[in-house]
């Protein structure tokens, strides 16, 4: 098993969350992202906490949230971009854990990497459509 990236000592406990809970969340956040946003690494406890961070609001259920943010490469890239750009309010009960995740996303370079992947997926799809249309209209012209 990989070494956790975050330790409880990095976080402050408060009346809503312990430092251990924050470390557990931050480490699971990294694991979820590093495993390619696999649904099997998206348990209910993580959904409930994640859906209330980075300006998200809870969706109807875990599956709806997953579909909205992790079902395509573009959505995964947009999710990580939101982690970086959503206004940050230090002092909120979970803000130190959010900031740790935000810093990890920034250092990982994943937004740019996923952006390249999105561009390649779009190009592949567009080239396939171009080939289909050329074949269709070349037949008609012949």
Tell me the role of every PLM-derived stretch.
Residues 1, 60-63, 133-136:
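Short, flexible beta-strand-to-coil junctions
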Residues 120-142:
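Short acidic, low-complexity intrinsically disordered linear motifs used
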Residues 1-34:
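Short, extreme N-terminal segment that most often corresponds to the first beta-strand
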Residues 11, 34-37, 42, 55, ...:
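Intrinsic disorder/low-complexity segments in short proteins, especially the signal peptide
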Residues 4-5, 19-20, 99-107, 111, ...:
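Basic, mixed-charge low-complexity alpha-helical segments
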């Amino acid at each position: 098993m990989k070494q956790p990236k975050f330790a409880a000592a990095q976080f402050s406990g408060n009346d809503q969350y312990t430092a251990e809970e924050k470390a557990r969340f931050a480490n699971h956040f990294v694991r979820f992202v590093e495993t390619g946003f696999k649904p099997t690494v998206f348990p209910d406890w993580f959904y409930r906490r994640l859906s209330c961070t980075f300006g998200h609001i809870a969706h109807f259920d875990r599956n709806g949230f997953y579909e909205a943010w992790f079902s395509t490469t573009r959505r995964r890239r947009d999710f990580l971009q939101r982690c970086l750009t959503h206004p940050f309010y230090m002092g909120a009960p979970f803000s130190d854990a959010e900031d740790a995740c935000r810093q990890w996303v920034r250092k990982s370079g994943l937004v740019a990497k996923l952006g390249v992947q999105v561009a390649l997926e779009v190009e592949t799809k567009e080239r396939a459509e171009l080939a289909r249309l050329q074949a269709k209209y070349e037949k008609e012209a012949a």
